[in-house]
């Protein structure tokens, strides 16, 4: 598992400090003695380090700490900057990269407070003292009056708060999202208090009371669409007495059931009059309907509890707002609507398709208003490629509302729509220049616009239409007419659910406005969205292509012409009485309205207002309400619909096909009854309401009763919020990392528990394990087999390597005999004597002969018997055992013949350092001769006799006086003190001079033969390795795992302080430990990812991909694995120390002579492990279990291991078959496939060779998330892609692991990256032809896929057979690699979880690209982070650098920011900020590479004071992992 650390910083910052090598324990420094050990002591041959190495490691740790401190300081500084400027977006980016809010802010940046004019001050003063509706022309500065009023209210509010009064806030209400952005930007530029802006698309309907309370506490002004405040009031998130000012923008909308009117009726008028907020309304005209002007205006005053006011000095206003010159453009009478040739073809064949009816109606009407050319071209929009999925989905939805599955007639209709699209694509459209193709109305517009735009001009024009289609078609037409200086654009409203190609986003609206301001567009074809409130810059030509219907439309659209010399043109049909009457009507109405407003006396009292209010409320009282007393939250007929929608959406996480409330309204006895149907998982499924006279009333009544029922069942809380939550997984932000560099002290087993079993008793039977030696070349002397006898049978151990003589590689083979050896007490005595004699003669240890305390016995093997004999007794050399039992040593007097002294093992009884093998008699030397000069110096160098003799000074004199000075001098081989034969000799050990000359009399001749003694000298290394195997197997047994010994030990072996840091100078390397866990951990990590992915997939059918990722993260994170390992005490089985000459001796014996190592054993029973190491061992055990196989399936034991180490109910499988048995087939999978799905299955089988039993699975695998599930009727591919991703990882890792047994995990990871990269998988998707089957709902995506497919196919054609052609192309759209992974997931599930299906796919379609992996050696190095690391390390020779990342958390719903920094010698050379650690690090690396681009090594070292070239070794770049 990659390391991950998240730390708190300054109370609100989480930093990430990654892959930091562990710091040394500076308080426990080791001192290495270089002097000769004192007489009589065993010396240590361990060379674990020196002072220079410790100093180097201390420096590395210090550098890491300094870098971490530097980064945390930087992160804190940047966090303050980011949070302090959170309300001020970065505006220096191109418009295309800015958010909508930033676009608005950029346009208003620098627009400071304007000087109020006299009429504005006049209205402001009136608004301070009473509720006021300001009626002023568009462009006269109504918003500025609102700003002045807000400043006044806020000032008083701050005073009230200081005096202890409850806080109140101001609301600026708007009628559209567009205005919310615009007005919020204006207020932020003019107020010094926090201003928030909200609209429905932000998901405010799902916010909790706590979220709202936070917003109310932190903002003085809130700009929002009116329905948001209405819902807050009804849900009692805020009360009317907590509001000090209500500003209604475009106040003329306050009528009927508009949210403005409902706020007044349902909340404002119900509040205590003394606690109501001030009201300020703004409008260009107080009415927007036809009828009695005075009556409508008076009613508006009543509804808003306000007085209409305008300036008493209209001349001042006219100086500011100049009226445009009004013109009437007359066009000839239009022809009646008629059917064009294309219309006739489509009507005849497809006129019965309901989804196309709106298009038929428009095109028929357009033939008259716009002309046949525009009418026909409308079909190109309606049946474009990006619209077809919408139409198809609409057909499916309608069909399935009647029956399920989709009937064949619906499928046929879908096919017919596609056929219609093909007809339109192949249709030859006439040129608009052909006579008769354009209507007289359009021809006139063309002529007029040519006059304005045929020469260079500063004219800016807006052409208003009533219909979105008309604006779009005019834009399309004038884009092709080639009027020299006309730059057309289109601005239409946002409408959800538009299925005929007219939909736009808020962002597209703003971009159009931005381009209009800048002049990039100078003629805007717009609908009413451009009439009202939008701050469109001055333009000098406004054309009403379609006439206004009301006074407000006339006033608003005329107000767009603000230039000093503007023209306002109304296009009217010649001889059309209705058009002429409308012109007169609006002008007279405007005069009457102005007269009414201007003649209002200042102190006028609105007579009859109480009765008017009563009549308003009476209509509401006829409708029921339901109030929750605890909070005051109110349920009304209108709010019930929103509450039910919110409740239904809260069940979305249950993966409903359609998480929405369904209303079915049916006629009944001259009235209507509505049935409410809630999503399937709702405990209350709905009800049927009471009859009502209108459909809308029936629907509201049923919704109201349903909400009451939900409340009764406690499914709605005290604020009418659902008790369910469409929640993000609870652990999405959990701190699941552990500190990779933190070390703790843990107990460590030094001996297996096997040795303690039955210890203290004399055995009657023993089990034999024969130990043999197979050298790679002849040794200097024979090494005879020995037998290890134990109370219990030992497992079969793998062979392993030791290094004998001068590093001759020798294989140690152990063979465990099945049958037990029954022994007598005499035989046990022989065995005990021999074992104790080995410790005495060979290792200078004298133990009390207590055979019951021995954990094992060592015996010589019989050389004459076959190794295959199963009888342990016949394998043992009992004659030699008897000889050794009877003779403690061989007296030299028994061998008067000098030849008898040759090929003996002799030892110094006083000094354990001196053991020899005798080789020859040297007749040229005598005992009295001085030792040859090449011999190592000893204390006494007077003679060879004196050189050989050890012992005290007094004993020496006596011995020398009586010894035989005529005895021969023997040439011998000094046995090295080296005990760790598991590793090759160190240089120090090689430098030891082993040739020596001694006299035999001061020494003892061992009764143990030379060939047995030679084998016994290897016994410490052998028993150390066997101990390690046994301890590792015990560790596996604690998890109930049956693992092969070699893999078990490898999984538990950590041979350095930083084993997990590959290709890095290893710290405190432990020699001779064999393979460490890193490769197994890499393999286990991959299997863990796959196993948990499968388990989550089968156990949680309702979870989405995000749930899967978060839940898998919780399972596989180092923190979880560490906690499991801690609980099961796996740390004690971990082998973190190499061979120790102190701990190999058996426990429990009584030492009589020799160095006592018990203190050393106690000290070495603890070891320091990083927390990450403990977690890594868990993954390595999974890898070991995988290699060990299973009883029925190769993965069985690994599955069991995953369950053991994750310790979670989310993974309970004990074998592979448990996955299949746990999987409940979802309904969509088992439903009968339709014709499309059967055809898809056949085509994909032809391409890939696998036949799906459930074609709907394949359908799901190829369904993009953009494709509406209600249309597709199968889930999108995200769940299957999640599963397939892990399967692909596993099959690729498995292939590399076995093909390259000697490659380290970093190499394997880097080359796996190529195999699973999006770049390769995208190319593979195109190669296999899968891209043509993707079902999506995105026009840009279609274009991206087409362009990529063309590029990758061209690259393959030009590659001349090279398999890496995909490397040179651009990255594919992500949907293509996702398709491949989803296909694998689908095939895997379809095959009942047969991994063979994944392997077959890999062998057939993937393996051929990766036979030669050297091609991809540089693949990973192209990554900016890897490239930076290589440059710093290899080119500059620098090792003191790091790349760190830290996350700055924000409030719920906010955008996460992550800062990454490259630090070189405590200097931050580059930074990058992004939404994730991964991309932040890429940005920081790219910037760092840019900084270093032309910098040579000398300049680098001078600039950053780098002296790393003088240091030993290199350290890794601290790159960590993505947050």
Swiss-Prot record:
Gene: dcl1
Protein name: Dicer-like protein 1
Family assignment from sequence similarity: Belongs to the helicase family. Dicer subfamily.
Entry keyword set: Antiviral defense, Antiviral protein, ATP-binding, Helicase, Hydrolase, Magnesium, Manganese, Metal-binding, Nucleotide-binding, Repeat, RNA-binding, Zinc
EC number: 3.1.26.-, 3.6.4.-
Gene3D superfamilies, sorted: Dicer dimerisation domain, P-loop containing nucleotide triphosphate hydrolases, Ribonuclease III domain
Intrachain S-S bonds: none
Site features described as Important for activity, chain residue numbers: 1374
């Amino acid at each position: 598992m990659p390391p991950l650390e998240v730390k708190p910083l300054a109370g609100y910052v989480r930093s990430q400090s990654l892959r930091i090598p562990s710091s040394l324990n500076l308080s426990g420094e080791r001192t290495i003695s270089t002097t000769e050990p004192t007489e009589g002591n065993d010396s240590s041959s361990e060379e674990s380090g020196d002072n220079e190495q410790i100093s180097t490691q201390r420096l590395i740790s210090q550098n890491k700490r300094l870098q971490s401190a530097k980064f945390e300081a930087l992160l804190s500084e940047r966090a303050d900057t980011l949070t302090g400027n959170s309300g001020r977006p970065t505006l220096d980016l191109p418009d295309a990269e800015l958010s909508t809010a930033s676009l608005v802010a950029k346009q208003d940046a620098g627009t400071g407070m304007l000087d109020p004019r006299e009429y504005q001050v006049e209205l402001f003063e009136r608004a301070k003292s009473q509720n006021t509706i300001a009626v002023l022309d568009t462009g006269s500065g109504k918003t500025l009056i609102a700003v002045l009023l807000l400043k006044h209210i806020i000032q008083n509010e701050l005073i009230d708060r200081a005096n202890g009064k409850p806080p109140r806030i101001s609301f600026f209400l708007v009628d559209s999202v567009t205005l919310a952005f615009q007005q919020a930007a204006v207020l932020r530029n003019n107020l010094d208090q926090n201003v928030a802006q909200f609209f429905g698309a932000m998901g405010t309907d799902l916010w909790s009371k706590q979220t709202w309370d936070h917003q109310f506490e932190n903002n003085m002004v809130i700009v929002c669409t009116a329905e948001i405040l209405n819902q807050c009031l009804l849900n009692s998130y805020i009360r009317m007495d907590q509001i000090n000012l209500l500003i209604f923008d475009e106040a003329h909308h306050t009528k009927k059931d508009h949210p403005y009117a409902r706020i007044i009726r349902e909340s404002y008028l119900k509040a205590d009059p003394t606690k109501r907020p001030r009201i300020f309304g703004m409008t260009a005209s107080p009415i927007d309907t036809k009828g009695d002007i005075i009556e409508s205006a008076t009613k508006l005053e009543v509804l808003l509890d306000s007085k209409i006011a305008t300036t008493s000095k209209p001349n001042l206003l006219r100086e500011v707002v100049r009226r445009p010159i009004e013109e009437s453009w007359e066009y000839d009478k239009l022809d009646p609507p008629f059917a064009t040739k294309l219309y006739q073809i489509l009507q005849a064949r497809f006129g019965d398709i309901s989804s196309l009816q709106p298009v038929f109606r428009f095109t028929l009407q357009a033939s008259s208003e716009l002309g046949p050319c525009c009418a026909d071209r409308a079909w190109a929009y309606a049946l474009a490629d990006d619209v077809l999925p919408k139409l198809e989905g609409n057909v499916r939805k309608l069909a399935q509302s009647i029956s399920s599955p989709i009937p064949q007639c619906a499928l046929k209709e879908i096919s017919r729509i596609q056929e219609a699209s093909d007809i339109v694509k192949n249709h030859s459209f006439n040129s608009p220049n052909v006579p008769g193709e354009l209507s007289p109305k359009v021809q006139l517009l063309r002529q007029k616009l040519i006059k304005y735009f045929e020469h260079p001009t500063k004219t800016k024009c807006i052409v208003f239409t009533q219909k979105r289609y008309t604006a779009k078609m005019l834009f399309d037409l004038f884009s092709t007419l080639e009027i020299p200086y006309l730059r057309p654009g289109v601005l239409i409203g946002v409408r959800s659910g538009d299925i005929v190609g007219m939909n736009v986003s808020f962002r597209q609206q703003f971009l159009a406005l931005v381009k209009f301001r800048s002049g990039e567009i100078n003629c805007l074809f717009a609908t009413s969205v451009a009439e009202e409130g939008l701050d469109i810059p001055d333009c000098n030509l406004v054309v009403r292509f379609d006439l206004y219907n009301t006074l407000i439309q006339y006033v608003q659209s005329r107000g767009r012409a603000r230039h000093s010399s503007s023209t306002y043109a109304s296009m009217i049909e010649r001889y059309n009485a209705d058009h002429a009457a409308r012109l007169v009507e609006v002008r007279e109405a405007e005069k009457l309205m102005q007269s009414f407003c201007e003649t209002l006396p200042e102190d006028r009292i609105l007579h009859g207002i109480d009765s008017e209010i009563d009549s308003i409320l009476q209509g509401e009282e006829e409708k029921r309400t339901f109030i929750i007393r605890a909070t005051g939250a109110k349920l009304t007929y209108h709010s019930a619909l929103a509450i039910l929608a919110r409740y239904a959406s809260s069940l979305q996480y249950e993966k409903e096909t359609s998480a929405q409330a369904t209303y079915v309204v049916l006629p009944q006895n001259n009235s209507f009854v509505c049935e409410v149907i809630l999503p399937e998982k709702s405990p209350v499924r709905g009800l049927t309401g009471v009859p009502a006279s209108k459909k809308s009333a029936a629907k509201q009544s049923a919704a109201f009763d349903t909400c009451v029922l939900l409340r009764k069942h406690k499914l709605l809380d005290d604020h009418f919020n659902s008790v369910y939550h469409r929640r993000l997984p609870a652990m999405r932000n959990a701190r699941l990392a552990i500190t990779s560099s933190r070390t703790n002290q843990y107990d460590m087993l030094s001996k297996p528990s096997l040795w303690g079993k039955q210890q203290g008793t004399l055995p009657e039977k023993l089990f034999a394990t024969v130990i043999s030696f197979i050298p790679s070349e002849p040794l200097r002397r024979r090494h005879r087999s020995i037998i290890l006898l134990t109370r219990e049978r030992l497992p079969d151990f793998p062979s392993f390597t030791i290094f004998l003589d001068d590093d001759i590689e020798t294989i140690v083979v152990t063979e465990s005999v099945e049958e037990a050896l029954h022994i007598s007490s005499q035989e046990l005595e022989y065995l005990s004597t021999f074992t104790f004699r080995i410790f005495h003669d060979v290792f200078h240890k004298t133990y009390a002969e207590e055979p019951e305390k021995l954990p094992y016995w060592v015996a010589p093997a019989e050389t004459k018997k076959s190794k295959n004999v199963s009888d342990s007794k016949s394998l043992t050399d009992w004659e030699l055992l008897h000889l050794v039992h009877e003779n403690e040593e061989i007296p030299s007097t028994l061998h008067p013949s000098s030849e008898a002294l040759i090929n003996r093992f002799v030892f110094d009884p006083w000094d354990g350092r001196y053991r020899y093998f005798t080789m020859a008699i040297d007749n040229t030397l005598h005992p009295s001769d001085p030792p040859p000069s090449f011999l190592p110096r000893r204390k006494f160098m007077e003679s060879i006799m004196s050189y050989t003799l050890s012992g005290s000074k007094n004993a020496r004199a006596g011995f020398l006086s009586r010894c035989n000075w005529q005895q021969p001098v023997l040439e011998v081989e000094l046995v090295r003190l080296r005990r760790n034969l598991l590793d090759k000799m160190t240089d120090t050990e090689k430098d030891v001079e082993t040739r020596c000359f001694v006299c035999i009399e001061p020494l003892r001749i061992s009764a143990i033969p030379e060939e047995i003694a030679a084998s016994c000298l290897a016994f410490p290394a052998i028993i150390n390795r066997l101990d390690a195997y046994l301890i590792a197997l015990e560790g596996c047994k604690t998890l109930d795992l049956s693992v092969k010994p070699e893999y078990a030990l490898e999984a538990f072996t950590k041979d350095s302080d930083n084993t997990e840091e590959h290709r890095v100078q290893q710290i405190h390397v432990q020699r001779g430990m064999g393979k460490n866990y890193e490769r197994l951990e890499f393999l286990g990590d991959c299997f863990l990812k796959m196993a948990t992915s499968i388990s989550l997939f089968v156990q949680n059918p309702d979870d989405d991909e995000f749930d899967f990722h978060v839940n898998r993260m919780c399972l596989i994170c180092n923190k979880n694995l560490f906690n499991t390992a801690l609980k099961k005490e796996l740390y004690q089985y971990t082998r973190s120390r190499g061979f120790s000459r102190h701990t190999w001796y058996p426990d429990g014996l009584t030492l009589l002579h020799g160095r006592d190592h018990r203190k050393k054993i106690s000290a070495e029973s603890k070891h320091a492990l990083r927390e990450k190491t403990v977690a890594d061992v868990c993954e390595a055990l999974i890898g070991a279990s995988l290699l060990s196989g299973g009883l029925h399936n190769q993965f069985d034991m690994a599955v069991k291991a995953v369950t053991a180490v994750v310790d979670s109910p989310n993974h309970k499988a004990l074998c592979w078959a448990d996955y299949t048995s746990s999987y409940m087939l979802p309904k969509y999978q088992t439903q009968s496939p339709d014709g499309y799905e059967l055809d898809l299955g056949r085509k994909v089988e032809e391409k890939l060779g696998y036949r799906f039993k459930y074609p709907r699975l394949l359908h799901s695998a190829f369904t993009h998330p953009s494709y509406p599930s209600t249309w597709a009727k199968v889930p999108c591919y995200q769940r299957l892609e999640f599963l397939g991703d892990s399967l692909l990882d596993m099959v690729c890792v498995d292939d590399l692991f076995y093909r390259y047994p000697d490659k380290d995990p970093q190499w394997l990871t880097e080359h796996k990256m190529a195999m699973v990269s999006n770049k390769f998988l995208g190319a593979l998707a195109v190669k296999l032809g899968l891209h043509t089957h993707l079902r999506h709902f995105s026009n840009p995506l279609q274009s991206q896929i087409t362009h990529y497919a063309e590029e990758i196919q061209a690259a393959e054609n030009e590659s001349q057979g090279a398999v890496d052609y995909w490397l040179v192309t651009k990255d594919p759209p992500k949907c293509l690699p996702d398709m491949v992974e989803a296909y694998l997931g689908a095939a895997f599930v379809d095959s009942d979880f047969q991994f063979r299906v994944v392997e077959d796919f890999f062998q057939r379609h993937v393996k051929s690209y990766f036979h030669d992996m050297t091609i991809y050696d540089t693949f990973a190095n192209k990554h900016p982070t890897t490239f930076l690391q290589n440059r710093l390390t290899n080119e500059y020779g620098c090792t003191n650098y790091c790349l760190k990342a830290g996350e700055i958390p924000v409030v719920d719903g906010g955008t996460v920011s992550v800062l990454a920094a490259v630090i070189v010698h405590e200097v931050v050379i580059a930074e990058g900020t992004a939404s994730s650690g991964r991309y932040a690090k890429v940005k920081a690396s790219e910037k760092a590479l840019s900084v270093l681009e032309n910098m040579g090594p000398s300049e680098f070292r001078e600039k950053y004071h780098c002296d790393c070239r003088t240091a030993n070794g290199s350290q890794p770049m601290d790159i960590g992992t993505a947050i």
